[in-house]
Amino acid sequence: MTAHDPAAVFDPAAYARGVPHALFRELRETSPVCRVPEPAVGPWPAGPGYWAVFRHADVKHVLRTPGLFSSHLGATQIRDPDTPGDLDFVRAMMLNQDPPAHARQRRIVAAAFTPRAVRELEAVVEARAHALVGAVARQGAADFVELAADLPVWTLAQVMGVPEQDRRLLVDWSNRVIGYQDPEHAASHTADPAELTPMGRAALAERPASPVRADGTPLNPRSREALADMFAYAHALADRPRPGSVMARMREGGLSRAEFENMFFLFAVAGNETLRNGVPGALLTLLDHPGQYEALRRRPELTASAVEETLRHWPPVMNFRRTATRDTELGGRHVRRGEKVVVYHVSANRDERVFDDPDRFDITRTPNDHLSFGFGPHFCLGAHLARTQTRAMLRAAVDRLPGLERAGEPVRLTSNFQNGLTHLPVRWRTDR
C-alpha cells in the first residue's frame, strides 16, 4: 500500500495515525469516485470492495437520492453483515430504512429531538457540563476523553429514562459496537454488577462470555447474538418506561420486535458514541489552534459557529454506506446494481469546491455547509441535542480551566468509521 493508494481509506490502522487528509485531497482531484478494496482486517473476512465518494456534491447527491442509493438493501456499514439473518435484523433499524418506512419510524420519536424539546434540556445539560468540569478543576490535569464521556451518557439516560446506576452499560455497549476494531474497546466491561439495578444485573447475565464463537469466528458486534444483554435490557426498560421518555414513545409506537430492538441500539450507541468522539475531537482541534481557542475564550458569542467549524474539521462519523438499486453513473464512473457506495463526509467537509481554504480552521467561517450530520432524509435526528451538548462542554472547559493545553500526545481510536480518541491528556492552571 503506497501513500497514494485509495486502499488506505479503508485501513483502520491508517486512522489510528490520523485521518489521511492529504490522500483525500488527492483523491478529490484525481479519483473523486473510485474503487476501494476490502481486505481482511484481523479476524474479519475480506469483502467485495466498494465505490468511495469523496467530493461534496457527489456525497450530497448520494445522500438525497434514496431511490437510487439505498440504505436498506445492504444496510449502512461498509462491512456486510455476516449472514442473511443478520442483514434482515439490522434492516429493521431506522438508520437502515428507505422512505417511506424510514419516515414512519422517525415520526415515533422525532418529538423528543425538536429544537423546542432540546431547549427544555439546555439548562440541565449546561449545568451538568459545568458540574463535570468543576469536579476536576482543582486537579490541574485530566484525560478529557474520560471527563467528557459522562455528558452524552448522562444526557442519553435522561432522554431514555435509564436509571443512573445503569449508565455504564451504555458505555460498554457503545465501546463494543463502535470500537470493535480497537483492542482497548472491543471487549469493554466497565459496568460493575454490584452497582447496577436488578434490571441491569439481569441483562448483564445475558452478555456473551466471549466475543468469539466456539469455532473461532468472531461475533459480529452489531448482531443480536453479540448484543443479547443490550436487547434484554431494552425490553426490561420498556416494561417500566418513564412517562414522556423516548422509551415510552417507542413502546407506544407500534414497532415490531426487531424495529424496537434496533431503535434502542441506535439511540444507545449512536446517541452516545458520536458525542464521545466529537467533543474531545472538538477540544483537541481548538487546542491545536491557539489563536482560535483564545478568540473563543474572549468571545462566547462565537461558541455556536465554533461548534459548526469543529464539526466540519473533525466529523465524528467519517463515512456511511449505500447500495445502488440499479445501474447508474456517479462521478463519471459506471456503478452496477447491488454495488456498495460509501460516501466520505470527512473528505466532503474539506472540498475546495465548497470551502475557501478548507484546511484552515476558522471559528467565524460562514457559510459552513458541512455534512457531519448527513444530508437528505437521514439527516441526523439528534443534531440539535448534539450541538447543545458540544457547546455546553466546550464552554465549561474554556471558561473554568485557565491555561488549558495538551499534557501529552492524544491516542486515536483504531476505526475506519468513527473519528475518535481514546485518550486526550490535558492540563491547566489551578491558581484561582
What are these regions (language model features)?
Residues M1-R432:
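Cytochrome P450
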